[in-house]
Curated annotation (Swiss-Prot):
This is Glutathione S-transferase omega-like 1. It catalyses: RX + glutathione = an S-substituted glutathione + a halide anion + H(+); L-dehydroascorbate + 2 glutathione = glutathione disulfide + L-ascorbate. Active as '1-Cys' thiol transferase against beta-hydroxyethyl disulfide (HED), as dehydroascorbate reductase and as dimethylarsinic acid reductase, while not active against the standard GST substrate 1-chloro-2,4-dinitrobenzene (CDNB). Belongs to the GST superfamily. Omega family. GO terms for molecular function: glutathione dehydrogenase (ascorbate) activity; glutathione transferase activity. Gene3D superfamilies: 1.20.1050.10, Glutaredoxin. It comes from Saccharomyces cerevisiae (strain ATCC 204508 / S288c) (Baker's yeast). Disruption phenotype: Null mutants display increased sensitivity to cadmium in the absence of GTT1 and GTT2. Null mutants also show growth defects on oleic acid-based medium, indicative of abnormal peroxisomal functions and altered expression of genes related to sulfur amino acid metabolism, and have low levels of reduced glutathione. It comes from the Eukaryota. GO terms for biological process: glutathione metabolic process. Residues 214-257 form a coiled coil. Its EC number is 2.5.1.18, 1.8.5.1. GO terms for cellular component: cytoplasm; peroxisome. It is found in: Peroxisome.
Length: 356
């Protein structure tokens, strides 16, 4: 059982007020729900304001863990205020050969980071710092942590996106771009919420319903439901593309500049969908047996949307770590027990992401 924390940050809040360097996101780079929060942080130019602490890629029976702190940990402080919390492999566009990487590998800022805030070794410790009588048995990411009060503000990725988008940290941002991207524009909020209501259960969670199915009948039902909804999204994006094609007389550059899920603007709808789709061919097709089609070969408009975000928006490209994505799923203890006993990480597909 997991417990949700639903706090927010605002100038009028009695406890959680905006402050530079006070709050941190704890998460796992391979986790799609953490990825949402990291994307929002980067797109809102909040890296200098909001720290990011990323765990080791393996989730074992005790949950997420962090690496031991190095000698003179203070000299690494700036790394936690970068797009990927200092993890080096996020700059690679291709996963490496991972067969000789053991689960106890502890390469600093490669396999994960240490915790510079509370110096904990397990994410569970953060939950118990927040509440010594924490009633849950699961310790989920992402976590938005207040280092001043040593309390969890929020651990729901969707809420964290909206907190970061609210403008509460804008006064601390130097970049003129901070007000350009509104991830939840007022005129699209109803459409965004409507989109979330089917994308979240049918696609974001749908891949897990397929991959963790415990009998063939359930698997077949869930995999068909998943692909029906991928096709639904394909139709949405096809319609968007055709409309843009007419508007811009086939000018590909202008089309791609407006090619998003909703309203010709980059919104929360794109942020919620991207982490699932970027992981699809790389992990879900083979590991979760979501194998009726691949994105690259079976959904041309969805695939174009994906590679457009990856190659044309640095925030998407440099928060996507194919090494961590593969290791996170393949070496997860529940995967070893139920899906891939020997934890063998597939080399393919190649490339991990097609060129635009």
């Amino acid at each position: 059982m997991s417990v949700s924390y639903k706090g927010t940050i605002s100038k009028t809040h009695s406890v959680f007020k905006p402050e530079k360097g006070r709050y941190y996101i704890y998460g796992a780079l391979g986790c799609p729900f953490t990825h949402r929060a990291i994307l929002a942080r980067s797109l809102k130019k909040l890296e200098p304001v909001l720290g990011l602490v990323l765990s080791h890629w393996q989730l074992d029976s005790k949950g997420a863990r962090f690496l031991p702190a190095p000698h003179r940990p203070e000299k690494y402080k700036e790394r936690f205020f970068t797009a990927t919390g200092g993890i080096a492999s996020a700059k690679l566009d291709e996963s490496e050969e991972l067969g000789d990487v053991n689960n106890d590998s502890a390469r600093l800022f490669v396999d994960g980071a240490f915790d510079p805030v509370e110096n904990i070794s397990r994410l569970s410790e953060l939950y118990y710092l927040n509440d010594p009588k924490y009633p849950g048995t699961k310790f989920t990411v992402p976590v938005l942590w207040d280092s001043k009060t040593r309390k969890i503000v929020n651990n729901e990725s969707g809420d964290i996106i909206r907190i970061l988008n609210s403008g509460v940290f804008d006064e601390f941002i130097q970049s003129e771009e901070t007000n350009v991207i509104d991830l939840v524009p007022h005129d699209l909020i109803d459409e965004i919420d409507k989109n979330i209501k089917w994308v979240h259960p049918k696609i974001n969670l749908g891949v897990y319903k397929v991959g963790l199915a415990e009998n063939g009948k359930i698997y077949e039902t869930e995999v068909k439901t998943l692909f029906e909804n991928l096709q639904k999204m394909e139709c949405v994006l096809k319609e968007n593309y055709k409309r843009l094609e007419e508007q811009f007389s086939g000018n590909k550059q202008k089309i791609l500049a407006k090619y998003f899920v909703l309203g010709q603007r980059l919104t929360e709808a794109d942020i919620r969908l991207y982490p699932s789709i970027i992981r699809f061919d790389v992990v879900y097709v083979q590991h979760f047996k979501c194998n009726l089609k691949t994105i690259r070969d079976g959904f041309p408009y969805l695939h174009l949307w994906l590679i457009n975000l990856y190659w044309n928006y640095a925030e998407f490209r440099f928060t996507t770590d194919f090494n961590h994505i593969k290791l996170f799923y393949i070496r997860m203890e529940v995967s070893r027990n139920k899906i891939n006993q020997f934890g063998i990480v597939p080399l393919g597909p190649k490339p991990d992401i097609s060129r635009l």
